[in-house]
Structures are given as structure tokens and as C-alpha cells.
């Protein structure tokens, strides 16, 4: 059974010992959510808190990374549970919104955000191409 929980510094170190390249994503005043199967971390979400300037003048959580490591566990609700956990944390911390950036071609990620009632705003480049979408959830 998969357990979703607030991650600890120990959990973060367990992740980094197995996936050292993830260290570049763990920055800022962050929150870690992990998905565990027994003692095995099978997924995680990292979001950092940052200020939003005028006209909002509030704080948001920006999701830097969300991943379910094992392909056979993807599309089984683990990502949704981690997103719901970060929404719960953000509400408790009284932030204004949660946002993330998604590559346009990542269709399964777009489905995850829509399922969790995030708005999707494609970012059109000067050449007319849409390279990324920003997703947002106002609390």
C-alpha cells in the first residue's frame, strides 16, 4: 500500500542517496511530499515557497518537481495524492496559490493538473510556438 506523507530531512537524504541528480531541485523554502511503498520511496513532490509581487502581494508554492519513479505505478493516483497533500500543506500555511510549469508535450502531466482542478495557461513564445504551460490553483 502506498503511503503519502510530509517528507523529512531524512527522507530527502534517502532520495538524494538514490538519485543524486535531484539535488538541483531542492532549493528555497521548500516542502517535500513523498510516496512510500513500505520503506521504498516511489515518488516525491518538491515545492518551494516564494513571494508574488504586486498586485497580489502574497506568497505561493511553486512545484519544482513531481515524479513517480516506477512506470508501473504511474497513472494510479499517486501523483494526485501528492498534489492533494501539497494543497493541504499550502492551505495550512495560508499561501495564495500553488503553481507549476509543464512542458507542452507532457500530456499525462496536464491531465494530472486538470484532474486536481488547476487552471492551465499556455505560454506562447514570440515565434508563436507554445513551449510550456503554467498551471495554477488559487486557494
Question: Which ranges hold each PLM region?
Answer:
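Acetyl-CoA-dependent GNAT
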Residues: 2, 6-71, 89, 138
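Preference for well-ordered, secondary-structure-rich cores of eukaryotic proteins
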Residues: 24-25, 35-36, 80, 86, ...
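C-terminal "cap" of GNAT-fold acetyltransferases
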Residues: 33, 122-139
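Conserved acetyl-CoA-binding loop-helix of GNAT-fold acetyltransferases
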Residues: 68, 75-88, 111, 115
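Conserved GNAT acetyl-CoA-binding A-motif
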Residues: 90-102
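Conserved active-site alpha-helix within GNAT-family acetyltransferase domains
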Residues: 104-122
